Amino acid sequence: MSSDAEMAVFGEAAPYLRKSEKERIEAQNKPFDAKSSVFVVDAKESYVKATVQSREGGKVTAKTEGGATVTVKDDQVFSMNPPKYDKIEDMAMMTHLHEPAVLYNLKERYAAWMIYTYSGLFCVTVNPYKWLPVYNPEVVAAYRGKKRQEAPPHIFSISDNAYQFMLTDRENQSILITGESGAGKTVNTKRVIQYFATIAVTGDKKKEEATSGKMQGTLEDQIISANPLLEAFGNAKTVRNDNSSRFGKFIRIHFGATGKLASADIETYLLEKSRVTFQLKAERSYHIFYQIMSNKKPELIEMLLITTNPYDFAYVSQGEITVPSIDDQEELMATDTAVDILGFSADEKVAIYKLTGAVMHYGNMKFKQKQREEQAEPDGTEVADKAAYLTSLNSADLLKALCYPRVKVGNEYVTKGQTVQQVYNSVGALAKSMYEKMFLWMVTRINQQLDTKQPRQYFIGVLDIAGFEIFDFNTLEQLCINFTNEKLQQFFNHHMFVLEQEEYKKEGIDWEFIDFGMDLAACIELIEKPMGIFSILEEECMFPKATDTSFKNKLYEQHLGKSNNFQKPKPAKGKAEAHFSLVHYAGTVDYNIIGWLDKNKDPLNETVVGLYQKSGLKTLAFLFSGGQAAEAEGGGGKKGGKKKGSSFQTVSALFRENLNKLMTNLKSTHPHFVRCLIPNETKTPGAMEHELVLHQLRCNGVLEGIRICRKGFPSRILYADFKQRYKVLNASAIPEGQFIDSKKASEKLLGSIDIDHTQYKFGHTKVFFKAGLLGTLEEMRDEKLAQLITRTQAVCRGYLMRVEFKKMMERRESIFCIQYNVRAFMNVKHWPWMKLYFKIKPLLKSAETEKEMANMKEDFEKAKEDLAKSEAKRKELEEKMVALMQEKNDLQLQVQAEADGLADAEERCDQLIKTKIQLEAKIKELTERAEDEEEINAELTAKKRKLEDECSELKKDIDDLELTLAKVEKEKHATENKVKNLTEEMAGLDENIAKLTKEKKALQEAHQQTLDDLQAEEDKVNTLTKAKTKLEQQVDDLEGSLEQEKKLRMDLERAKRKLEGDLKLAQESTMDIENDKQQLDEKLKKKEFEMSNLQSKIEDEQALGMQLQKKIKELQARIEELEEEIEAERASRAKAEKQRSDLSRELEEISERLEEAGGATSAQIEMNKKREAEFQKMRRDLEEATLQHEATAAALRKKHADSVAELGEQIDNLQRVKQKLEKEKSELKMEIDDLASNMETVSKAKGNLEKMCRTLEDQLSEVKTKEEEQQRLINELSTQKARLHTESGEFSRQLDEKDAMVSQLSRGKQAFTQQIEELKRQLEEESKAKNALAHALQSARHDCDLLREQYEEEQEAKAELQRAMSKANSEVAQWRTKYETDAIQRTEELEEAKKKLAQRLQDAEEHVEAVNSKCASLEKTKQRLQNEVEDLMIDVERSNAACAALDKKQRNFDKVLAEWKQKYEETQAELEASQKESRSLSTELFKVKNAYEESLDQLETLKRENKNLQQEISDLTEQIAEGGKHIHELEKIKKQIDQEKSELQASLEEAEASLEHEEGKILRIQLELNQVKSEIDRKIAEKDEEIDQLKRNHLRVVESMQSTLDAEIRSRNDALRIKKKMEGDLNEMEIQLNHANRQAAEAIRNLRNTQGMLKDTQLHLDDALRGQDDLKEQLAMVERRANLMQAEIEELRASLEQTERSRRVAEQELLDASERVQLLHTQNTSLINTKKKLETDISQIQGEMEDIVQEARNAEEKAKKAITDAAMMAEELKKEQDTSAHLERMKKNMEQTVKDLQHRLDEAEQLALKGGKKQIQKLEARVRELENEVENEQKRNIEAVKGLRKHERRVKELTYQTEEDRKNVLRLQDLVDKLQTKVKAYKRQAEEAEEQSNVNLAKFRKIQHELEEAEERADIAESQVNKLRVKSREVHTKVISEE
């Protein structure tokens, strides 16, 4: 506590800041009983002081100060603090902390007019309602540089602490001044600005005045003057406050690197423009109106055409017109002066006053209704003329635009009539808009004036927001203000209670989390979250028919009863109507919603706006131009692009945007809180209402803040910082010369200091202190430093005195010597012999001439020798001098290059600032776009509700349809039962008819099942289609962001090229300067060379000196003259020498710089100094010798004088060059300092921008997620509605079709019954004929042998086809079952995946938000650590001894940064995983879409097949009638055909053996592939994330293969159905075989297509293999991600197992397809035999077989590729190895069979060599086997030719039917081709989309990498600039010390 003497510096403010010593002593000596002195609860006063009299049974009886005796419970009694704590400055120091103690401490301090009190970490101030002398200049000076504990509580102390934190922590600061309206926020804001403007004034006022040009005041004056101007136009009187800020402002004061004031800017929020046209009774409008009418400046009254009576103007006279505490006349002069100081031009100043006057005139405009019309018309034009005059408009045009505005309808404009009320509303809207835009324009102009373009490093922001206030009539503006205060209170709570405790947990300190119950999230979410009040308001604004009532109904429907903070208002008598109530932190507020929709939309008369834009008043035209609109919406002074294009932005949306930006700014700074309190409602000085103050304390969290300050550790410091700063307290605790960890060093240091060791804790990276301990350590450090400095001063003074004493002794000895000689001379002066000596001595001069000549000759020889030696030394020194000069030039070049680099860096900094501004604009656009989407979402949500109502109605219709459908189903089942009974009756008929009937029934059931499946799949596909559109929209957004990034990169590239060009120009100019300098150096060398020549000439002349000795006497007089000239020359030489010494000092400075870099040239400098001294001595000797010999060189005097003059001129030139270089040097130093500070500012701004970008990106992603969810719901409802409509029509149509089908089946049943009876009768007749012809058959057996064999062969083929058909039917059923189960399963999995994705996205968003907050704190830590590292590097250069320890500390810091950076990368990886999961869902969407389209095609195919079957039934009925005639003949040859069947069976087995042989080959290849796979699998395990995409691509290929196989199955089914028609007749079977051959060719073509797709798959696989090499480089990063991706890998493995099952099914289907291909090959051999018989061209058959063989080989290659593809997708190697082992065993069993087949293949190879040896060599085992079969079949076919001739007639009859069948097959083939085309198209689209996504992702990563590199380069440049700055300062210091 300071003494009275120490408090004297505060002047007259001392009594208002701290108690006097006398009061403190009295308080300590005051009697006090701790047990009896208490506070008790009181109904009126809340708490009163009392004395305990007794305690009984939980009750306490006490006597109050008023003399009353009360009895209360124990929990209503609170202990009183001792008297020494009365009026304590920091309430956290109280012994007993509770509400009454805090209340009475504030009350007692307030009674003593001590309005500022510390409350833990923040400050509380109470409004005194009177002027106190606590803000005088001496108070500002007293608080400057003082620590918090050294001075009394004050707003200046808070400001100075923020200023010091900014300089030491290198972090932006903010001061949040909060409180209710009237608590004194605005006054404290002004005092903060006053303090900064006083202590941090700019350094060079002259320079500022020179650069400011038209600026009429200094920057400090302008910052201070901004407040009066803004208060005049933005402050007004309210019920609770005479000077209430009706807008919010965030003032940022920027400082340079040295803490000097650099610039400032102001952001404003939500001006209450409704006050312009409406005020309550106890309030008034903005001050400016009443200031103008105060008549202080009569010229304004005249210019504005107004009066001095406010009641003459309706807009400003609805409430009070005067305020006792405000002098409007003085305020007008202050406002007018502020306008001048802030640099507004005269025209702008006049425009401001004119627009203000126009607003007042607008309120007096009158309108009336036309007779018999609702149209309004002007009621007089005088007022309109005045308003038009002030705004430079035509009054007639203005009135016309108001009464008859033009409205755009479509593409045309029409004139609209207005009622009187509409005109008044339009005038009011225009007045409010004009005033608001003018206010925002003024803020913009102020910011332009305050932006001095000086380098700025950090800023301190001061927040002054309109306070929480409860009016009788609360509107939308009041809701916004209260919501802002709610958010700020939540920010305070989160910072004070949540972040503080999270810091303890993170640092590992034992701490139990305390929930203070201060979370305001419920109220905030009620207002701002989706479907909150703002959301509903904006949604209603989009509906043209929305009203206030509909808005209120939606609010009640959405929130009443669901949220405790939303209540119905309780009507009160005498108060305005209210529609809903909100429970805020500071009280419950009733809100009236009348006019909210119009206020939020803020409509303007566009016709009048058009007039404004053309106004002759330039300021008005600018206000309503497009550019100003953008600026106005930017929140005052912040430049930004145009907001939302053609759409509009509501007031609430703009307010939320500005508020979010404010909260982002605050989160990026270190906040300091100042809590302003209202003492009473009556504005009475000194009075305090207890309940009011307690309510504010509770709401503001004051008590909780004190508690956490007392319990927690509010002070914390990094271990390295603590070690560096406090090591001086006990240096012996930390051993020197050995490394010790900073944490251990801190622990040892604290353990060795005499302090309370319970007052601190050690965290992981910091040491934490209780409140006050750090101040104690600071005091101890100051004392220790004082001791050390005292000792140092004593040692220095002793040394200096010893040096002085030594000099005194030397002078004493010299004086003694002189005195002795003088005394001796005085003794002999009168001696006669001495007198004679004096007389004779001059006469002996001539006699002694010869001696003198001899002496002179000797002297001459000595001088000559000395001259030679000196000349040699001079040359040597000149060479060294040249070398040093060269070194100096090199160093100067280096300095110049560094200066150029710094200039380049400055230009880059400027460009980065511009880029930052552009990025901020883009961020604004993105935010606005996101808000647009939110608005659209809100609109769509409303539509969703309507659709839900419609859906409920449609559901009722669906229920009715379902009932009808159930009836139809019953009828259908009954019909199916009848058909089943008929089928059972027909079971005894012929086998062929039974099979046909079963097939027909199966197809009907499949048809019905397919229809049902189709309906179910349509629903699923609709859902998936919506997901696809959502993903496509996301891809579009990514592409848009990518385009923006490309544009930004192009801009940066252009800026880079421009900077490089500027750099080249600067380098060229530098080179020119260097060339000039080198030329001057060369001239100097030339002159020095001439001097050496002169010296040599002098030597020559000295030889002539002997001859000229006779002339010495004559020249002695001349010598005296020359001596005078020589003296002058010596003076000039001395001057040149001084200049040379200056150059030497420059050289020494540069050498010192080198010494700082390397520390190796100090010895050289000392040697140079010695040599320089020797050189000076020699030169002096040389000059003396020269002067002696100049007596003999009179002839050369003139030349010598000329040369000296010339050298003098050169020296003057050099002096001028030196001065120029000195000037450039000083300028470069200044530029270096500026650049350093600028670089620091840019780096900080860049960090803030990155934080802002990340925050906005998170917000954007959250908004997009919400938007997509809403869009998906709406699309689902729309599609469901459309689907239900179509379903109802489809059901009706299907019902009609089923009825027709039932009737048709009934008719077919009757016809079949008749046909069966007829066939039975025919069968009996044929049986009789058979018995009669049995004998004839035996006699003709020999002739029919061949026919029997042929029949058996064909019968076998028929049986094979029947088996294949049955197998195909079973496969169809299997595929259908699988499709249904897979579809259902996939749908369920998709739904589950979607839920998981939504949950994970939500978790990811929460995690990202948490990580962002961590990143923000880490960014601050990183910046602080980086700056500290720079300081440490400076310490390293100063002290090499501590280098090792500091390097280790630097590495520790780097590790911490790397760990946090890794965490950041891991978080980013999680986000990427979420994106990839989204992409996997998109692939599932494509799969289901393909399946859906296939099912549609199957439905169409089945419909056509149904029609064809009906046609076939009729055809078969006719054929059966004919077939009955041939049954008898077929029975005859049955035995022959059975024999042929056995032969065909044998050949089939041989073909199967060959196929198994080929499969053995495939298995061997598979083993090899498994080996390769085992090698690749290791790499794949490390790259699950990248290969997952490839797996999806391959899965789509397999699915396309499956669709192709399905098409093949359908085509084979068609072929089988065609063949069944031919079963009754042998000729028909032959033609059917021919048809089957064509079908086989088509199947082969399908296989070719499949092979093509497999080739594409192989290409993708090759690309993947090549990409593996690239992926190796990413191995390290993937390993770090492996742990985080483990959960995703588990899920992917589940999907991989499903994929594996699908692959196995595909492989099985592939084997089945191979078997069916083999079967088709067998049929083809029969077809080829028939062709040979018909065409007799074996060579053509061989060619065709070669083609077939080639296709078979391609099929083989396809199998290989499919296996390779499957191997790439495989994850579980053991299953594959087991399969390989099993196949290996099969291979060994089949080796013997292969050997037998090899013999046959050799024979076939010899036969095939005739047709072409080269092709036969390429054929493999299966081809050889097929050729052997061809040869065997040829032999049998030659024998069967005879039988075929007998059947030629029947072939001709069946040709027509074959042609019909061929047409059917062609149609089916066309359908298959179309399906395959669709599959390929979908596949290509999917691949293109994936490729595009990958390309975008790669580009994004590349851009991110480049951004990181740019950041690193900026950091490096910043560190270099700081080093240069430090070096420059040290050099400057040394120069000063040397001078």
UniProtKB/Swiss-Prot annotation:
Modified positions (Phosphothreonine) in chain numbering: 64, 69, 391, 419, 776, 1241, 1255, 1265, 1286, 1467, 1501, 1517, 1730, 1736
CDD domains referenced in this protein's UniProt entry, alphabetically: MYSc_Myh4 (cd14915)
Region (Disordered): 1128-1147, 1153-1172, 1276-1299
SUPFAM superfamilies: Myosin rod fragments (SSF90257), P-loop containing nucleoside triphosphate hydrolases (SSF52540), Tropomyosin (SSF57997)
Domain of life, source organism: Eukaryota
Entry coiled-coil feature ranges: 843-1939
Residue ranges of domain Myosin N-terminal SH3-like in the record: 33-82
Domain-related comment: The rodlike tail sequence is highly repetitive, showing cycles of a 28-residue repeat pattern composed of 4 heptapeptides, characteristic for alpha-helical coiled coils.
Entry protein name: Myosin-4
